[in-house]
Amino acid sequence: QRQMCIRDRNNFVQAIDKWETRWKEPFRITQNIGRGVVFTGNDKWKNYSVSSKLNFHLVKSGGLIARVQGLKRYYALEVTAQNKLRIAKMYYDLEILKEIDFDFEFFTDYNLTLQVNNGHIKGYLDDKLIIEVEDKNNPLDFGGAGIVAEDGTICTDQISVS
């Protein structure tokens, strides 16, 4: 299986308030109000995993996104400031597909992986499966990968797709 490690910000669509180069992390994105995303990929990306070691700075929620088909269509594996970990589907409006309790702390690194395989969506923490769901209601079948931040800042050194 091929793995691609992305560290070059020029390969990304940016729909975010701030993505500055003055920080040590190549990916340090801030969305002041609402949800902002950065992503790469195309409609040939179907079944894959996206992984990253993410650090969250005072966000309402944030995490990884997969099968991105624009700003309003994607799956997300997110942590929230309300101590939840969830798999969500953005299909013009945000739908929480599954949510579990999660002991979340700001300014802490989390190794997350979001895996999409047909209608099955799985979330991993430190390579351990911790949440999964099947989307049977108009599933997203293809699209790019990236990260999402809601009302705050998240950062990472790289995003891996395999």
Residue ranges and their predicted role:
Residues 21, 79-81, 116-118:
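Generic beta-strand structural signal
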Residues 1-6:
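Short, small-residue-biased leader/transition segments that mark boundaries at the very start
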Residues 114, 157-161:
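Extracellular beta-strand elements of beta-rich domains used
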Residues 91-113:
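Short, aromatic/His-centered strand-loop micro-motif at the edge of beta-sheets
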Residues 133-158:
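Flexible glycan-contacting loops in extracellular carbohydrate-active proteins
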Residues 52, 106-134:
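Carbohydrate-binding surfaces in secreted/extracellular proteins
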Residues 29-95:
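Secretory/extracellular carbohydrate-interaction modules
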